Amino acid sequence: LANELAQIAENCGIDVWEAIELANKHPRVKILQPGPGVGGHCIPIDPLFLTENSTKTGIIHLARDINESMPNHVIHSIRDILYGLKDPTLTVIGVSYKGDVEDTRETPALKFIQLAKNEGYQVKCHDPCAKGFVYELLEMDEAMEDSDCVVLMTNHNVFRNINPSLLKMRNKNLIDTKNFLDHEKWRDSGFNVKILGDGHYTGHSLQK
């Protein structure tokens, strides 16, 4: 539900994070937070056990379809931001399935990276927590160098310590899929910031 609301919010020009915060003030409402998809060894798989012996499970399948579509939704945002840029490079920060864990099983970051590569983007990855990921994990400086867009996929607390003014990127763009970073700090460092689910975004890519 939260991820579908995020997509609706972007189309309607509203901030889904504000809308969810207001809705959750009602004592009988508890909408979760949107994001780039759902991973791990439980949530993406276990609900499907309920569908094995029943045909009346439309909501379960629909929920999975929406969550599975979120990496593609992030790709659409990147297309708009980096349109026309030659040989674009993305830096993915966070590849484990959730913040402050090393587990990368069923992580939506993997699907996102594969989609990005299929679209012709160069992709570099950085994650100080993850282990056993299929793509090489670089140190922060190397992952950021000459990149055109940072894509935060996992909300590791250590990422709050990034100093965006020190990043040696070719173009300064940030997509925050978790509404996690200090966006004013990034904007003050010259970054064009897009937050998943924030329909107020009207920025354009900063391209050299």
Task: Cite the ranges covered by each PLM segment.
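Structural/interface elements that position substrates and couple domains in central-metabolism enzymes
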Residues: 1-208
